[in-house]
Amino acid sequence: MAKVTNRCFEATGHTAFICDFSPPRAGDPESFPQPNLDTDFISVAYNPGKAVRVNSAMLAAAIRGKTGKDVLFTLATRDMNKLALESLLLGGQMFGLDNVVVVQGDPFTERDLTRVKDVSDFTPTQMITAIADMNLGTDYRESQLRTPTGYCIGATLDLGRGIEAEATLAHRKAQAGAQFFISQPIFDVTEASRFHEAFAAASGQELALPVFFGLQVLEQDGIIFSTVPGTVKMELEDGRPGVEIALELYQDFQEAGLHNVYLVPPIRRGGARGYAATREVLAGVKRL
């Protein structure tokens, strides 16, 4: 199985795509979701919408086993203690998984907390450190593992929370052991250059790790979690196809030298995803 750092633009000289993929809300093997997405990697999300869904690592292993696609799985620190998280990572190792993305997980509301507990035994940065330690053969108790793990560790960025603050946090994550970054969708490519400048200012050196900047495929009636410019919203409302908007933004990415792309399919009410539109975008990219 390929590691993200071996398939990114910096390693190959070719644009690399990671595509987000939501686990189903059923474990019936007969309803196994077929991604059918021509991307370098399928990234299995962690319980989108804070809903009960198939475990991200298990689904990633199933996708890899049934389709041969290279995969990532997302792991949230919110829901498990150190023992559970590190045990899950050993299970992923057993199934040949090599790429993991560490997130905190969306915070629970007060209503949520009447039914479920926030564990947060690790912060995301601490979890990154712990995985890096497991790669060296040591668990959270400082006991030796029989076999070190070999995870390629991903961390996340949300430039909408403030570029300078996010750059400082990214520096800490890189120091902890992150090997690549995935960002929430951006619509202004200058945010990428400003992030790199802020990272250099915070760390004293340029960021040498690959960053997969988010490119969201929009639909008129879809749910939008990222900050979308008013002009783009107006274009959608006026009937411009989201696929067309995404392809135009992809060209902006290319002109700005952003050759690692995190593709986010449309999100529909109820949690369904618009993978058909995503396939149109990928087909359009090949024609450019």
Task: Place the predicted regions along the sequence by residue.
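Active-site mouth loops of central-metabolism enzymes
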Residues: 13-29, 71-83, 151-165, 230-245
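Conserved N-terminal beta1-alpha1 strand-loop-helix module at the mouth
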Residues: 1-44, 53
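A structural motif corresponding to the C-terminal end of an alpha-helix
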Residues: 130-142, 146, 151, 176, ...
